[in-house]
From Swiss-Prot:
HAMAP family: eIF3a. PROSITE patterns: PCI. This is Eukaryotic translation initiation factor 3 subunit A. One of its GO terms (cellular component) is eukaryotic 43S preinitiation complex. Residues 576-707, 784-881 form a coiled coil. Its main location: cytoplasm. It comes from Drosophila grimshawi. It holds the Pfam family eIF3a_PCI_TPR-like. It is found in: Cytoplasm. GO terms for molecular function: mRNA binding; translation initiation factor activity. Belongs to the eIF-3 subunit A family. Keywords: Coiled coil, Cytoplasm, Initiation factor, Protein biosynthesis, RNA-binding.
Length: 893
C-alpha cells in the first residue's frame, strides 16, 4: 500500500497549526514527511517549496535539530543548485541568520542571569555556595551560566557553519556564498573565542582546497584554474590569517601563509600590491612571534622595498619611520654562528638549511638570507640615509666604527631615546633586548682585538646594561659556537682572549668593524702571507716569464685551432641537424600528448558523469534507508504508546506519567519508560519503608513503657523462682551423692575381679621381651661388621689422599724455590746492568768535564790572543794618529 503524502501547501498549514498549539515536534515531523517524498522536488517550483523550507529550518533552529536541517538543506541543494541558485543562497543565509540570532539571545540571557545573581544580595556578594563552586570547578558564575545556557547554542551554530560549508564546497555557482560563510565562521570563532573549532575549521578548508586541486572536472565542481576562484581562495586565506593572528594561533597563521603563497604561485597574474603588502606585514609578524629575527627583518625589508616602489604618495615621515623599523630589525639580528652546521645535531625532523630554504621560498628569495646580506641590501637601498641622525649613528657605531670603550654608552643613549618615546615608537620597543645582546657581542669581539685579557669588573663597566651572569652566558655561547677563543679565570676574575697560538678553529672573516686579527689567526695565516710575498718576489726577479708563457700558450692554441677547425665545423653542422630533428620529434610528441590529453579529458568527463550518477544512486539509497528507519521509528512509537497505555492502568504508572508532558514522553523509548516506572515503584517502596520506620519508632516507645510497668512483677516472680530453685537443687544434690556411693562400690568389686589376671599378663610380657632382645643382638652384630668394613675403607682413602696432598705440597715448594732463584738471578743481573750504566754515565760525565775544561782553556787562549791583537790595533791606531800631527809640525817648521 502506498504511503500517504500531503501537498506542500497543506503540510505548511498543518505545521502552523501544530506550532500554535505548542507542538513543534509534530510540526517538524509533518514538514519532514514532505521532504522525504521522492516526487515533491520534481513537481513543485521553488516559490512553493521556499516558504516551507524556511519554516522547516525555523523549527530545526528552535529545537536545535542540526542533523535534520542538514538533511533538508542537502535535498534543497540537489533540486535548485542548477535551477535557482539565488533561492538556495537565500535559504542558507536565512538559516545561519536565525542560528546567529538565537545564539546572541542566549548570550544576552546568560549575562542577564549572572547579573540577577550578582544583584540578589548586595550584603552577601560571595555566598558560601558560590565560593564552594568556584573552589571545586575553578569557574565563576559567568562560566557556569555560559556552559548551561550559551554553550548548546554555540555548538548548534558551529554545526550549522560546518554543514553549510560541506554543502557548498563542490558547487561552482555558490562559490562566493561558500567563502562568505567561511568568513562568518571565522567571525564566530573570534567572537566566542573558540580556538579548537578554529583549528578544525582551518583543517576543513585546507582539505576542501586539496580536494579541489585533485579533481576539478566535475559538471558543477569548482576549478582552481579559474582566476575568480583563485582570488576568492586568496581573500579567504588572508582573512583566515588575520583571524589567526587576532586569536594568537601562530601555527595556524603559518599554515595560512603557506596556503597563500601556494595560491599566489598558482595564479598566472601577479597579485595586487596591497595584497602583497598585507602578506609581507603578516609574515613579518608571524616570524617575530616565532623568534626568527632573521626572516622577520627580511620580511620587513621586502615590505619596505614594495611600499617604496609602488606607493608614490608616501610622506617623508612615513618613509623615515619604515626605514627606522627595517634598520633596527636588521641590526637586532643576532650575530651568526661560525658553524651553523652544529645545529643539525640537535634537530629532530629537518635540517636548518631545509627549513631556512622553505622560509626563503615564502619570501620569494632564491636562497636563505643572512645578516651580512640583509645589511648589504639595507645599504644598497640607502636605508641609513633615510632614517634620523640617531639611528644613522646607531648603524655606524655597530657596523662601521671601531670604538669598544664607548660602544655601549652610545647604544644606551639610543635605547633611552626609544624607551622615552615608547608611545610613538611602539614598533621599535621589542628590539631593545636583541639590540643590547648584539651590542655586547660586538663589544666582546672588539675588546678581544685590543686586549689579551681584561677583568670582569672592567668589562661590566663597559657594558652597563648587562650583569655578570648574562655576560658569562654570552662568553660561553661564543666559545660553544667556535666564534672566539676565550678562557675565563674565576680565580683571577679575568677573561683571556686568543691565548692558544697553535689553534684556530676557522678562517677569520671580520663581520663588522675590525682592528686586527686574533693572535691565533695571525699564526694560522703565516704560510698564506709567505706564499703571497714569495709570489711577488718571483714576479720582480723574472718580470718577463709570465709574458713568454702567455705568448707560447697563444701560439699553441692557434696551431691547435688550425688542426681541428674543419672537424669542429662539421661537428657544428651535424649538431644543427640534430637540433632540427629533435625539434620535429618534440613537436610530434606534443601533438601526441595533446591528443592523449583530450582523450583523457573525455574519459575524466565520462567518469565524472558516472560518479555523479553513482552519487545520485547513493543518495537515493540513503533516502530509502532513512525511510526504513522512519518506519522502524513509527513502530517504536506505536510500542511506546502501548507501553504508556499499559503503565497508565497502575497507580504508580499514572503518578509517573503525570510528571511528563507529551514532548518528554516522545523523547523516551519503551525501555526508558519501563525504567521510569521501576524508579517510581522504588520511590513508593522507599516512602512505604519510611512510614514503617516511623511506626516502628512509635511501637518502640510503647514497648519501653510496658517494660517499665513489668519490672516490679518480674522482681516478685524472680524471688519466688529462687526459693523453688534452691529446693530443687537440694533434692538433686542428695540424689547425686547416693548414686556416687553406689558407683564406688561397683568399682571396688570390679578391681578385685581384675587382680586375678596379673600373673598371665607378666608371663606374656617377659616372653615378648626375650624375643625382641635376640632380634636386637643379631642386628647389632651385622651393624658392627659393616661399621668395621667402612672404617677400613675410609682409612685407606685418607692415606691415599694425604699422600697426594704431601706430593702436591712438595711440588709447589719446589716450584716456588725455582722461581725464587730465578728472581734472585734476574735482580742480580739488573743490579749489574745498573752498575755498568752508572759507570758508563760517570765516564761520559768525566769525558764531558774534560772536554769542557779543554774548551775553556782553548777559549781563554783565543780570548788572550784577541786581546793582544786588539791591544796591537789600538797601539797602531794611536801611533798613526800621532804621526800626522808630528809631520805637520815638522812641515810648519
Amino acid at each position: 500500500m502506498a504511503r500517504y503524502t500531503q501537498r506542500p501547501e497543506n503540510a505548511l498549514k498543518r505545521a502552523n497549526e501544530f506550532i500554535e498549539v505548542g507542538k513543534p515536534l509534530r510540526a517538524l515531523d509533518t514538514l519532514q514527511e514532505v521532504f522525504r517524498n521522492k516526487r515533491w522536488n520534481y513537481t513543485y517550483s521553488e516559490t512553493v517549496i521556499e516558504p516551507l523550507m524556511f519554516k522547516y529550518l525555523y523549527l530545526c533552529v528552535e529545537l536545535k535539530k542540526s542533523h535534520i536541517a542538514k538533511e533538508g538543506l542537502f535535498q534543497y541543494r540537489n533540486m535548485f543548485q542548477l535551477v535557482n541558485v539565488n533561492s538556495l543562497e537565500n535559504v542558507i543565509r536565512g538559516y545561519l541568520k536565525m542560528a546567529e540570532e538565537h545564539t546572541e539571545a542566549a548570550q544576552a540571557q546568560s549575562s542577564a542571569a549572572v547579573a540577577v545573581l550578582e544583584l540578589d544580595d548586595l550584603d552577601n556578594i560571595a555566598t558560601p555556595e558560590s565560593i564552594l563552586m568556584s573552589a571545586v570547578c575553578g569557574e565563576d558564575a559567568q562560566d557556569r551560566s555560559d556552559r548551561t545556557i550559551l554553550l548548546p547554542w554555540v555548538k548548534f551554530l558551529w554545526e550549522s557553519y560546518c554543514q553549510c560549508l560541506e554543502l557548498l564546497r563542490v558547487n561552482t555557482h555558490c562559490e562566493a556564498l561558500y567563502h562568505d560563510i567561511a568568513r562568518m565562521a571565522f567571525q564566530f570563532c573570534l567572537k566566542y573565542n573558540r580556538k579548537s573549532e578554529f583549528r578544525r575549521l582551518c583543517d576543513k578548508l585546507r582539505k576542501h582546497l586539496e580536494d579541489i586541486c585533485k579533481s576539478n572536472n566535475q559538471t558543477t565542481g569548482v576549478s582552481i584554474t579559474k582566476p575568480e576562484t583563485q582570488q576568492l581562495c586568496l581573500d579567504t586565506r588572508l582573512y583566515l590569517l588575520d583571524s589567526a593572528i587576532q586569536m594568537e594561533l601562530w601555527q595556524e597563521a603559518y599554515k595560512a601563509i603557506e596556503d597563500i603563497h601556494g595560491l599566489m604561485a598558482m595564479s598566472k597574474k601577479t597579485p595586487v600590491p596591497k595584497t602583497m603588502a598585507n602578506y609581507y606585514q603578516k609574515l613579518a609578524m608571524v616570524f617575530s612571534k616565532a623568534g626568527n629575527q632573521l626572516f622577520h627583518a627580511a620580511a620587513l625589508l621586502k615590505l619596505f622595498q614594495l611600499t617604496r616602489e609602488l606607493k608614490k604618495n608616501l610622506t617623508k615621515e612615513d618613509l623615515q619611520r619604515m626605514a627606522a623599523h627595517v634598520l633596527l630589525a636588521t641590526l637586532s639580528i643576532p650575530l651568526p654562528s661560525a658553524h651553523p652546521e652544529f645545529d643539525r645535531f640537535i634537530e629532530a625532523d629537518k635540517s636548518p638549511l631545509e627549513k631556512a630554504q622553505k622560509l626563503a621560498v615564502l619570501l620569494g628569495l632564491p636562497q636563505p638570507p643572512t645578516r651580512v646580506s640583509l645589511i648589504r641590501d639595507v645599504v644598497r637601498l640607502n636605508v641609513p640615509n633615510l632614517v634620523s641622525d640617531e639611528f644613522r649613528n646607531l648603524y655606524n657605531w655597530l657596523e662601521v666604527d671601531f670604538n669598544p670603550l664607548n660602544l655601549c654608552k652610545r647604544i644606551q643613549s639610543i635605547v633611552d631615546t626609544i624607551e622615552s618615546t615608547e608611545k610613538e615608537n611602539t614598533l621599535l620597543t621589542p628590539y631593545i633586548q636583541s639590540l643590547k645582546d648584539v651590542t655586547i657581542m660586538r663589544l666582546i669581539r672588539q675588546i678581544s682585538q685590543v686586549y689579551e685579557s681584561i677583568e670582569f669588573k672592567r668589562l661590566l663597566e663597559l657594558a652597563p646594561f648587562c650583569n655578570i651572569f648574562e655576560l658569562e652566558k654570552l662568553l660561553v655561547e661564543s666559545v660553544r659556537h667556535n666564534d672566539m677563543q676565550i678562557r675565563i679565570d674565576h680565580q683571577r676574575n679575568s677573561i683571556f682572549f686568543g691565548t692558544d697560538l697553535t689553534e684556530s678553529q676557522r678562517e677569520y672573516r671580520p663581520d663588522g668593524p675590525a682592528l686586527q686579527s686574533m693572535p691565533s689567526e695571525q699564526i694560522r695565516s703565516q704560510l698564506v702571507n709567505m706564499s703571497t710575498v714569495l709570489t711577488r718576489a718571483v714576479s720582480v726577479v723574472y718580470p718577463n716569464r709570465e709574458r713568454d708563457q702567455r705568448a707560447k700558450l697563444r701560439t699553441q692554441m692557434v696551431q691547435h685551432y688550425h688542426e681541428i677547425k674543419d672537424r669542429e665545423h662539421q661537428r657544428i653542422l651535424q649538431r644543427q641537424k640534430i637540433i632540427e630533428d629533435r625539434k620535429e620529434f618534440i613537436e610530434k610528441q606534443n601533438n601526441a600528448r595533446e591528443l592523449e590529453e583530450a582523450r583523457r579529458h573525455e574519459d575524466e568527463s565520462r567518469k565524472a558523469k558516472q560518479a555523479e550518477q553513482k552519487r545520485l544512486e547513493q543518495e537515493q539509497e540513503k533516502r530509502e534507508r532513512k525511510r526504513h528507519e522512519n518506519e522502524i521509528q513509527a513502530i517504536k512509537e506505536k510500542s511506546l504508546k502501548e507501553k504508556v497505555q499499559q503503565i497508565s492502568q497502575t497507580a504508580h504508572g499514572k503518578k509517573m506519567l503525570s510528571k511528563l508532558d507529551e514532548e518528554g514522553i516522545k523523547k523516551l523509548d519503551a525501555e526508558q519508560i519501563a525504567m521510569r516506572e521501576s524508579e517510581e515503584l522504588q520511590r513508593e517502596r522507599k516512602e512505604l519503608q519510611s512510614k514503617i520506620k516511623s511506626q516502628e519508632k512509635k511501637i518502640d516507645y510503647f514497648e519501653r513503657a510496658k517494660r517499665l510497668e513489668e519490672i516490679p512483677l518480674f522482681e516478685k516472680y524472680l524471688a519466688e523462682k529462687n526459693v523453688k530453685d534452691k529446693e530443687f537443687w537440694e533434692s538433686t544434690e542428695q540424689t547425686r551423692i547416693e548414686l556416687d556411693i553406689a558407683e564406688r562400690k561397683d568399682a571396688v568389686a570390679q578391681q578385685a575381679r581384675l587382680q586375678r589376671m596379673y600373673p598371665d599378663r607378666d608371663e606374656y610380657l617377659n616372653a615378648l621381651k626375650k624375643e625382641r632382645a635376640s632380634l636386637y643382638v643379631e642386628k647389632l652384630k651385622k651393624f658392627e661388621i659393616a661399621l668395621a668394613e667402612e672404617r677400613k675403607k675410609r682409612l685407606a682413602d685418607r692415606i691415599v689422599r694425604r699422600r697426594e696432598e704431601r706430593r702436591q705440597a712438595y711440588l709447589r715448594a719446589k716450584e716456588e724455590e725455582r722461581f725464587r732463584k730465578e728472581e734472585e738471578i734476574r735482580h742480580a743481573r739488573e743490579a749489574e746492568e745498573r752498575a755498568a750504566a752508572e759507570a758508563r754515565r760517570l765516564e761520559r760525565e768525566a769525558e764531558d768535564e774534560k772536554r769542557r775544561q779543554q774548551y775553556e782553556k782553548q777559549r781563554a787562549k783565543e780570548e788572550e790572543a784577541e786581546r793582544k791583537i786588539q791591544e796591537d790595533r789600538d797601539r797602531l791606531a794611536r801611533e798613526v794618529a800621532v804621526e800626522p800631527s808630528t809631520c805637520f809640525s815638522r812641515r810648519r817648521q
